[in-house]
A protein has these predicted regions:
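Extreme N-terminal starter segment of soluble prokaryotic enzymes
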Residues: 2-5
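Glycine-rich Rossmann-fold phosphate-binding loop(s) that bind the pyrophosphate
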Residues: 10-11
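N-terminal Rossmann-fold NAD(P) dinucleotide-binding loop
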Residues: 14-15
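Conserved N-terminal Rossmann-fold NAD(P) cofactor-binding segment
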Residues: 33-73, 301-309
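Rossmann-like NAD(P)-binding element
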Residues: 53-115
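Rossmann-like NAD(P)(H) cofactor-binding subdomain of soluble oxidoreductases
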Residues: 88-154
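C-terminal substrate-binding/catalytic lobe of Rossmann-fold NAD(P)-dependent dehydrogenases
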Residues: 134-140, 149-309
Length: 309
């Protein structure tokens, strides 16, 4: 347990993240901050009143300012507008870049030693904005992408094979968008390669559904986007850091030569511990996977160049 974790943004993702952080008692205090007056206060009060029922002692508070977030050990940034039907993650670029910039400026002055987990979309570029504005080292700025994309991939495989999701081992790398790279060569069910259990055509359909997993939910909801699975993914990253678990999780990290790529955030296997990013694991990829990762990197670089800081 750490002393304080802050969640920026009291929308569906932020509020659900705060609730799960409190239920897991990962921090003595969970702070939810949002510009909408009354929203974080009301949701935090509601969550705190669930404590006697759920049996947690983490205090949940809501605020519109950053003073109560001061000296947070971990800050999860979920602030920004959500995707609407027909809107790509990149359509969110300009609006959310401005929001994340303002948030990062506040964080820099109130919690200069915090570890940041960025959830706002477009994820890879917003992670870049947060690192650039705060000046934090790459060990303390991570993007939540691969954990969520991998969860979707695993869920679809488990559904197709009618097996437990717990027996699916998989990893999705690359950008958090249409160019993400599910690694077929590292996908297995209790150690059995997925290619021995499923025809290629069926696997291809799952790969495509994984890439459009977020858009599929947006299409159903019509007025919002996913939040249960994204919040679970963010909390899993927080848990790995708080408990110093040394988990190997696919996260968006700032690359400095790994996989032959530099100067961008991209989903790669990361070892997470109490210091944040402890190392990036370079796994052997097939030629097709390497090419796909390079293509994904190109797709991330393009909107990065359009960001004005």
């Amino acid at each position: 347990m750490v002393n304080k974790i802050t969640v920026v943004g009291a929308g569906n993702v932020g509020a659900t993240t705060a609730q799960r952080l409190a239920e897991k008692e990962l921090a003595r205090t969970v702070v939810m901050v949002d510009v909408m007056e009354g929203i974080p206060q009301g949701k935090a009060l509601d969550q705190w009143q669930s404590a006697p029922i759920e049996g947690f002692d983490s205090r949940v508070i809501g605020t519109n300012g950053y003073e109560e977030t001061r000296d947070s050990e971990i800050i999860v940034i979920t602030a920004g507008i959500a995707r609407k039907p027909g809107m790509s993650r990149d359509d969110l670029l300009n609006t959310n870049a401005g929001i994340v910039k303002q948030v990062s400026q506040q964080i820099k002055s109130t919690s200069p030693d915090a570890i940041l987990i960025v959830v706002s979309n477009p994820l890879d570029v917003m992670s870049y904005v947060a690192m650039k504005v705060t000046g934090f080292p790459r060990e303390r700025v991570l993007g939540m992408a691969g954990v969520l994309d991998t969860a979707r991939y695993r869920a679809f495989i488990a559904e197709a094979l009618d097996v437990s999701v717990r027996d699916i081992q998989a990893m999705v790398l690359g950008g958090h968008g249409d160019t993400m790279v599910p690694l077929i060569s590292y996908t297995s069910v209790s150690g059995i390669p997925i290619t021995q259990l499923m025809p290629q055509a069926k696997l291809d359909a799952i790969l495509e559904r994984t890439r459009t997993g977020g858009a599929e939910i947006v299409k159903h909801l019509k007025t919002g986007s996913a939040y249960y699975a994204p919040s679970s993914a963010a909390v899993q990253m927080c848990e790995a850091i708080v408990l110093d678990q040394k988990r190997i999780l696919p996260c968006a990290a700032w690359l400095e030569g790994e996989y032959g790529l530099s100067g961008l955030f991209l989903g790669v296997p990361c070892k997470l511990g109490r210091r944040g990013l402890e190392s990036i694991i370079e796994v052997e990829l097939t030629r097709a996977e390497r090419d796909a990762l390079a293509k994904s990197a190109d797709a991330v670089r393009e909107p990065m160049g359009a960001v004005k800081l």
